[in-house]
Design a protein with these regions (language model features):
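Hydrophobic beta-strand segment of the Class I
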Residues: 81, 150-151
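A short glycine-rich, Lys/Arg-flanked "PGG" loop and its adjoining helix->strand segment in the class I
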Residues: 96-97, 163-178
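A short acidic, Gly/Pro-enriched loop at the edge of an enzyme's catalytic core
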Residues: 140-149
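Conserved class I S-adenosyl-L-methionine
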Residues: 178-205
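Glycine-centered, small-residue-biased loops immediately flanking beta-strands
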Residues: 79, 103, 177
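Class I SAM-dependent methyltransferase SAM/SAH-binding core
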Residues: 82-139
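Class I SAM-dependent transferase core
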Residues: 26-82
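Core SAM-dependent methyltransferase catalytic element
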Residues: 216-238
């Protein structure tokens, strides 16, 4: 097991390398530079699309127990879900099946190549309720007040502009909408991920409440990740 963990740690450190010119180009001069460090946390770089096969590796379900994560989301048919940092669709395709044809998944990524991989995978499975969206580093381009659940799996720590992204996500939520945040546990040294790609609960709570969110639920039964649910701090009760 130790050998497997070591190999995994090496692998994840390899696939997060960013090459020039691969992230969606930004033309808005108003986009500020990334702070680099946010509330004491160094911001990680975005994973390059050449690492996409790692996202759908055979061992991912066993290592992360994605089936349990999906059950914990409590999704209903007909809901609108935004999968931000969707990559090549490991969760997107499953989400689309859960919400059914009457629901929709807005799949957001900042790399066109990732979205092309996703489109190919969706077409191969005949899934038609996915809306691919090319976002930017400050805006996931979600329709305001329309999303039931925003899913962030191992991606928030890579947001180069966390405050702008959280503000945009907050605007996209319905009055009872939720954000499901999954991040590798920084508190657990046995989780074979580089520290830069982990977050502690304490750090998460340093970042979300000041940006207009309240913690409403925690799920602690995943092998490697925290799963924390947030709503707008002014959210109405269901």
């Amino acid at each position: 097991m130790q050998r497997v963990a070591s190999q995994f740690a090496v692998l994840i450190s390899a696939v997060v390398i960013v090459l020039p010119g691969t992230v969606a180009a930004e033309t808005d001069d108003a986009i500020p530079p990334s702070p680099g460090v946010y509330k004491g946390r160094e911001i990680a770089q975005t994973m390059h699309y050449l690492g996409a096969p790692w996202l759908t590796r055979e061992s991912r379900e066993r290592e992360e127990d994605g089936s349990t994560l999906l059950k914990a989301l409590g999704l209903q048919r007909g809901e609108v879900v935004a999968d931000i940092g969707c990559g090549n669709g490991f969760y997107t395709l499953k989400l689309a099946k859960l919400v059914g044809p009457e629901g929709k998944v807005i799949a957001v990524d900042i790399q066109r190549e990732m979205l092309e991989f996703l489109k190919e995978a969706a077409a191969a499975e005949g899934i038609k309720n996915i809306d691919p969206v090319l976002g930017t580093v400050i805006d996931p381009k979600l329709p305001e007040g329309s999303v039931d659940l925003v899913l962030l799996v191992d991606v928030y720590h890579e947001f180069s502009h966390p405050e702008q992204m959280l503000a945009a996500i907050r605007k996209s939520l319905k009055p009872t909408g939720r954000v499901a945040l999954a991040e590798f546990r920084a508190e657990d040294p046995k989780v074979p991920i580089k520290p830069l790609h982990k977050m502690s609960k304490a750090q998460i709570l340093k970042e979300f409440p000041p940006n207009g969110f309240k913690l409403v639920e925690e799920f602690d039964k995943l092998p490697w990740q925290h799963l924390m649910f947030f709503q707008r701090d002014d959210a109405t009760k269901e």
